[in-house]
Amino acid sequence: MKRFLWLSWMAFLFLICAGCGDTFRPIIIPNPPTFPDPKAAHTVIAVNDNGPISDGSVLVVDVSGDSEVGIGNVGIAPVHAVQQGASQVLVLNQATTSTSTASLSKVFFFGTVINGTIGTISLPPNSAPNFVTVAPSDTTAYVTLPNYVPDPTNFPDVVVPSVGVVSTTTNALVATIQVGNCPMEIAVTPDKSKLYVANNSPFCNPLTPGGSMSAFNTLDRSARPITGTLSSPPVWLSPRADSQRVYVLEANGTLAWLDTTVTAGPDTLTESPISVPGATVMVYDGHLNRLYIPGGSEVAVVDVSQSVPQIIGNNGNPLPISTFPRENRGPQDVCYGLHTDTPPAVTAGAAAALPDGSRAYVGAYYEDAAGNICSQVTVINTSNNSVKAVIGVPGFPNYDATCATTRFRFTMAAGGDSSRVYLASCDGGGVNDIDTSTDSFLVNLPAPFSNRAPIPPSQFAPPQNPVFLIPGP
């Protein structure tokens, strides 16, 4: 035992001596890393129309700086867009003349900046594409082709409404899937296993009634049976995060849902008693598992965590949206005026939910007697599902030549850090920036100049017309 103690002392003395040499050994004090600002840069991207013969554009807005950081040209008559992966956005260009070609524009990003040349994927000519979606984290895009002609040489009059399957790796249309008349909306379940298509005949031709749903397995593109019927044509689809439900908004405002839990099908279609007349879009909030359905002068807040969707708040009824008083607008606002006890009713047509789940925002507008579009944003507090505030957004003259018939006259998107929400206006030619910390209007970011003639007294061409808005990389 004493021997082991003696050896231990000798080892200890050796270590002390070794540390007392002439060589300096600095004491290293760890320098903690600088963590990124939680309000990291995020973008929103506005897709802008520039008339029937000129290329449209994308406008990139930096959320952290409330500024425009990039502009890129896309194809003629862009109508829709979707983000694919962390650094790529696909823009769908409908094209409007025999000399232009329908296409997908591939916009690459490095951070918040457009990176390199915007690529192009050609689509069948004159196929009138109107919607694009992708499977999450996939390299496949699905595009509606209402006027697709499989053999334009031998059978130029034979139209087969289809969904185009596009590889964004090879930049080619790899297959088509026949669907019902006038496909206008596509949804892919988050697990990438199923594809659903809303077919709406009146959307392509108001004189043609009817509508239907189509369903397919994405692996082999085989059809899935659907049981149940709709009382009016479908206009919007929203899959639930668990891929077990797909919600269907009908043209009459009724909310229906598809039960997709049976592996081989059939998928069961059921209508709910929920109705929001005038609604054309829905926004799914995956954080809270609910839908926001704006329409008319109201918005329905719908809990979809249950088997049967239920309206929450306001005693089971949609929340009414009041008109922002015109006397509360600034004197320079074209919509400014004296108080009236009977303000015009607004039309709600866009919504966005903050990623942090704290609030939702609804875009609405009315047109005054002078032809001005008077827009506003209503704030919904998600903790008690009530209206928190109404924000006036400066008005502007209408531009019915393009915007009266565009599918998305107003669109909305939220910044990735929940600090901003944006309202894009086709008529207004720009993107309105809302500060969510104060629920107040900040600034209007104009779209790029168009190829239209100046409108006196201005000497400059008016801006292009935003027709869609999405959160970006």
Question: Where are each of the predicted segments found?
Answer:
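Sec-dependent bacterial lipoprotein signal peptides
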Residues: M1-G19
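Predominantly soluble domains enriched in secretory-pathway, periplasmic, or organellar proteins
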Residues: C20-P473
